[in-house]
């Protein structure tokens, strides 16, 4: 009797690996783009929350002093935040998902270690809506 050999041939394994490689080549860039879009969505939502708090601050200042004003540091209007690192020291963030302010720019370090920033000017009541890559 002849022994039965079961299993995959080398050609079959190579074809499966090739198919997985092609699928990965298509899926990975899409996945990275999706992550980038989610980071942008989060940043816009976060800065919108800051904007709302700045407007509330300006309203309170008008009631107290008779003049609207925004704080020098936009991060100072935030309360407690989950999953966000807010650092009040100056400079560029060095941790993932950290936010810092340097006097004119509100910096955010994304999960892929890219640093993006939003322009801020308390004198002109200005906070940019879209980030710029550093």
Describe the residue ranges of each PLM region.
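Helix-centric, low-specificity signal for extended rod-like, repetitive segments
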Residues: 11, 27, 37-38, 73
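Membrane-proximal N-terminal amphipathic helix
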Residues: 36-63
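Alpha-helix boundary/interfacial micro-motifs
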Residues: 29, 38-41, 46-47, 70, ...
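N-terminal single-pass transmembrane signal-anchor helix
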Residues: 2-31
């Amino acid at each position: 009797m002849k022994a039965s050999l079961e299993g995959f041939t080398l050609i079959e394994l190579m074809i499966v690996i090739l198919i997985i490689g092609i699928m990965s080549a298509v899926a990975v860039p899409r996945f990275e783009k999706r992550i980038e879009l989610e980071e942008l969505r989060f940043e816009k939502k976060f800065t919108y929350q800051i904007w709302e708090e700045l407007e509330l601050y300006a309203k309170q200042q008008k009631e107290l002093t008779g003049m609207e004003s925004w704080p020098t540091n936009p991060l100072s209007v935030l309360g407690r935040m989950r999953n966000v690192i807010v650092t009040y020291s100056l400079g560029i963030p060095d941790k993932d998902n950290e936010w810092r302010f340097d006097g004119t720019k509100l910096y955010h370090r994304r999960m892929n270690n890219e640093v993006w920033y939003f322009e801020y000017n308390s004198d002109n009541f200005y906070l940019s809506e879209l980030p710029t890559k550093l």
